[in-house]
């Protein structure tokens, strides 16, 4: 029987420790241990709303969104599509909704040979202005945006933009899109001029999980 020397035993112990350490490294996970894709449980939208981007969470390289449609392919309340811009997003809008109501958007995500089926409840309601008041200088622009998200003013106006939101609503972004094709960031309580282009205001109601895009422009 061959005698095992101390250096051989030490080498074996070191190798075992290294293998054990590799197993403890964060991020070294099997395919089965990866988190499954998920989607928001529910959202609220006004009728005739712009595209809202919905991100699919826990997407990984190689995952593909193969389907994004309203339940029963019924587009009377809401429309849904796969995104042309990002692999982990879908678009939802109510451009062509003929009625209010509640339905679901169904999404399929292919991961390897497995298909993950997701669903999100969508409640579509009639437009109610989220603004308590809105002025540009001395011009009351709130009147124009009372019944629609796309306000057409009778004439151009300039001055300080002053917007107060209703309870639960906040402004997340204001920008102006002009004839040059470039967007310019604006701020509430700062001077604006509608002759430079349409003003877009993104607002959010966190509790309802509702994000809307409002706009102001002079009539053409």
Where are these regions (language model features)?
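Non-cleavable N-terminal signal-anchor transmembrane helices
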Residues: 6-8, 24-27, 105-107
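Bacterial N-terminal signal peptides
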Residues: 12-25
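Beta-rich interaction/scaffold domains
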Residues: 33-64, 70-74, 81-160, 164-220
